[in-house]
Amino acid sequence: MPDTIIVGGGLCGLALAKSLQERGQDFTLYEARERMGGRIFSERCQRNNLAVDLGPTWFWPDTQPRVTRMILSLGLDTFAQHDQGDILRLNTTDEKPEVMELTEVHGGARRVVGGMERLVTAMTAQLPVDRLNLGHTLLSVEEGDDYVILSFRHNERVVQVNARHVVLALPPRLLEEHVLFDPPLNASLREAMRATHTWMADQAKVVVAYDQAFWRESGQSGNAFVTHEQVVLPEIFDACDATGEQAALGAFFPSHRHCAPPFRPPPWPC
């Protein structure tokens, strides 16, 4: 029976596993997906082989010292998010965008060369393979006499494991919605879990690759904000690689579209 079971192979779960490994403490990690990293996910563009982050992209050394130290300790190269140039705003559909007075958007943010998924790969490489279990979806958490019983769905069957300690490195809202607890959690805790927002959970990302960063050549930063009622991509940013040779623009795409009016395109010329 392992001393500690970690449920969730995102950044939080991996960081805890790495810490326990460095201390020589026993642990086993279970992840529902068939990959580690959680919402950290990088994909290669077919157009120019650029590694783009479809999940977390940036870190801020001034305000996130722990993750900064971890990235540096793993020997990962980083670069500053490109913010130099004009920042645009489009308020109406039939006018040209205006130049904003802002001088930067991302406030000293940096990115990992090759995509943020390199952080996940580097962390996972330091952990024993036999302690990492993919494809295990947590179903229930049951309190035993002096241990905890966890039930997972794995390959269309239910697997039970016991541990002295359990760390649930998952969004509280997902735990409350999908995991059965015995004894049940009290009402106030369940309410708090339901009310805990998962940062950026209602946003998706779109990345478009180009042959060259034409916006930089014209003195623009790549940052733009679209605020009119037919907006599809409200915030756009430069997503090029560290050299600027692999060109791309990224954008946030709100997943909740029920509040926005339907898009009605004008007649397009033939």
Mark where each language-model region is.
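FAD-dinucleotide binding site
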Residues: 1-270
